A protein has these predicted regions:
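Conserved P-loop NTPase motor core
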Residues: 1-582, 588-627
Length: 627
């Protein structure tokens, strides 16, 4: 069995300079993209299109013929007809671009165009999105369209057994989350013993090697990445690590000693934080050596001792309950920062997870030993063809080109955007902010206008819930702890008088439909209660209102002591905490500065991860091992 994927050599300085020059000199031609609209009038039969696509590739003529068939299938099975702008978006994706489409413009329907066209051409298509909920929803929604074209569709979800996964990956089109497919790829690498080489695979098959029949995927042929900036940028700061448990009993005392020593240190005197990472002072290093001296064993080496204690300081101060993780059923479960969802089968590495378990006084799980690892940057660059779509990509257009060779094509809206942005309000203290949030909700609720309130953490959403209860305002809560009724809550969020409080679970991919009469009330009103590290995530929240030409309104009600400002604009934020309400210009400047610094720090982290990942890959390749 062949396992097609791209083999990219490591780039040098001159290569990166050439890439930058190509970005500056090249541009997406709007005129060229719009030619697909005329080509979609073709009336070629399905079987002829299928045969010619496999033989001739994605020419304008054949893509137009395929799009015409897909549009007809969607209209027949779903009563949905692709708009011209969706044809343009689909053509951009098919050409290996990232289509930037305004939120609410129908990316799910747009995706059927390149996905079905590539599948008709015989490519194994992966439609990759940010979570299982969206993957399953979109696969089931568009299944009738694909089946009308004679194509099979499947959906990979967490908890599936290998045999079930293997069968689903044999479908023409597979919907899945970015984490599920990346871990399945790493499992295949373990099965194959490293990078799959075509010649070696053929020789192995002739020699009776059965490993090819045990792999899950059919290679990395054609990927369409939904919410591409979230997957390719926001989640690219952390490597994907396939691991196996190690006996925890032998290491438990080491973790307990590390926490005990860390708690004995004093901030500023013994340690400080730089870029949110703990660092020991000279006095701190001496104090650690003094406390570790009687312990012996692994504590004998000063560098190792300092590393243990720094990790314990990270667990104590950088990771907060109900923000970064939940304690559920006696276990520490990670909350995905970008989606607001739980990741119960994931754990932090290098003993951090065990240190947090001890901090929370729950049963200790075994540290996990790394079997294989890869970054999203390296994984997605291995696809033979990758395209994508999102509502927010312009801010990171250069990084998308430099890392993935993805150009951003901005697609116009089908109807004018009627979303109204109210001026930001930045208060000096959180108490004043929450009072203003309650008052804004009360005013909208009195007018029967539905309200969606976005928070960054479970703790913040539950704090607001208590305030709403005290104000006797009815609401629904959606967060990682209260997620059982997600579809039902979202389906009612656009009804008159509804108040919905949610974390990022109600952000990307959430389509809140307005009930009859709500347009006349002004549409959905969205309140952002805390800025995210990236302005793109804020835009995604605001994009839940004013979709597809509907009216809508949004506002940000913030505080100078919110986490983002406190961490990334500490000095500036300190000037304003004594004020009740900041002047508009000062508030905008404070959060502009904080977000720029946060995004710069994340960009450095992504570059550092890619460099380290490439170096590790070179080292392991030299040693004859896989990733």
């Amino acid at each position: 069995m062949q396992y097609p994927e791209r083999d990219l050599p490591r780039e040098g300085t001159l290569d990166r300079l050439l890439v930058a020059a190509q970005y500056l000199t090249g541009r997406v031609s709007s005129k060229q993209l719009w030619r697909i609209v005329g080509a979609t009038r073709s009336t070629l039969p399905l079987e002829e299109v299928r045969i010619r696509l496999r033989r001739e590739g994605f020419s304008l003529e054949l893509a137009g013929a395929a799009f015409a068939l897909i549009r007809a299938a969607a209209e027949k099975t779903k009563g949905m007809r692709h708009h011209d702008v969706q044809l343009v978006g689909g053509w951009a994706i098919l050409q290996g671009m990232l289509a930037e489409m305004e939120t609410g413009e129908g990316k799910t329907l747009t995706c059927t165009l390149p996905a079905a066209t590539a599948a008709l051409a015989g490519r194994a298509v992966h439609v990759i999105t940010v979570n299982d909920y969206l993957a399953e929803r979109d696969a089931e929604t568009m299944r009738p369209v694909y089946e009308a074209l004679g194509l099979s569709v499947g959906c990979i979800k967490a908890g599936m057994k290998p045999d079930e996964r293997r069968a689903i990956y044999r479908s023409d089109i597979v919907y899945c989350s970015n984490k599920e497919i990346t871990f399945d790829y790493l499992k295949d690498r373990m099965t194959l013993g490293g990078r799959p080489r075509p010649i070696a695979q053929r020789l192995g098959a002739l020699a009776g090697d059965e490993r090819g029949g045990k792999v899950l995927l059919r290679g990395l042929q054609f990927a369409i990445v939904d919410e591409a900036d979230s997957v390719l940028i926001d989640e690219a700061r952390t490597p994907l690590i396939l691991s196996a448990p190690v006996d925890a009993a032998k290491e438990e005392q080491v973790y307990r000693d590390a926490l005990r020593i860390a708690k004995a240190l004093t901030e500023d005197e013994h340690y400080f934080f730089e870029d949110n990472q703990p660092m020991l002072t000279e006095a701190g290093g001496e104090r650690v050596r003094e406390l570790a001296a009687p312990l012996g064993g692994v504590w004998s080496g000063p560098r190792r001792s300092e590393r243990f204690v720094l990790q314990a300081l990270t667990a104590l101060h950088n990771f907060q309950r109900d923000k970064h993780y939940l304690v559920r059923d006696g276990k520490v479960q990670i909350i995905d920062e970008n989606t607001g969802r739980l990741m119960p089968d994931r754990s932090w590495e290098q003993g951090l997870h065990q240190l947090i378990e001890l901090k929370e006084e729950v049963e200790l799980t075994g540290r996990r030993e790394t079997l294989a690892r890869i970054s999203y940057q390296r994984f997605f660059r291995r696809y033979l063809h990758v395209g994508g779509m999102t509502g927010t990509a312009s801010e990171v257009a250069f990084e998308l080109w430099a890392v993935y060779r993805l150009r951003v094509a901005k697609i116009p809206t089908n109807q004018p955007v009627r979303r109204v942005y109210l001026p930001d309000r930045v208060y000096g203290r959180a108490e004043d902010k929450w009072a203003a949030v309650i008052e804004s909700i009360r005013e909208r609720h009195a007018a029967r206008q539905p309200v969606l309130v976005g928070t960054r953490s479970v703790a913040a959403s539950e704090h607001l819930s208590k305030l709403l209860e005290e104000a006797k305002l009815p609401f629904r809560l959606l967060n990682a702890r209260q997620d059982a009724d997600e579809a039902e809550i979202v389906s009612h969020a656009g009804e008159p008088g509804r108040i919905t409080v949610a974390t990022n679970m109600a952000g990307r991919g959430t389509d809140i439909k307005l009930a009859p009469g709500v347009k006349e009330l002004g549409g959905l009103h969205v309140i952002c209660t805390e800025r995210h590290d990236s302005g793109r995530i804020d835009r995604q929240l605001f994009g839940r209102s004013g979709r597809q030409g509907d009216p809508g309104c949004c506002e940000a009600i913030l505080a100078a002591d919110d986490d983002l400002a406190a961490e990334h604009a500490t000095l500036a934020a300190g000037w304003f905490t004594h004020m009740t309400l900041l002047p508009q210009r000062a508030g905008r400047l404070l959060y502009w500065l904080a977000q720029r610094r946060a995004e710069a720090a994340h960009s450095r982290a992504r570059r550092s991860l890619l460099t380290m990942d490439e170096s590790l890959g070179d080292l392991l390749a030299f040693s004859g091992r896989g990733e």
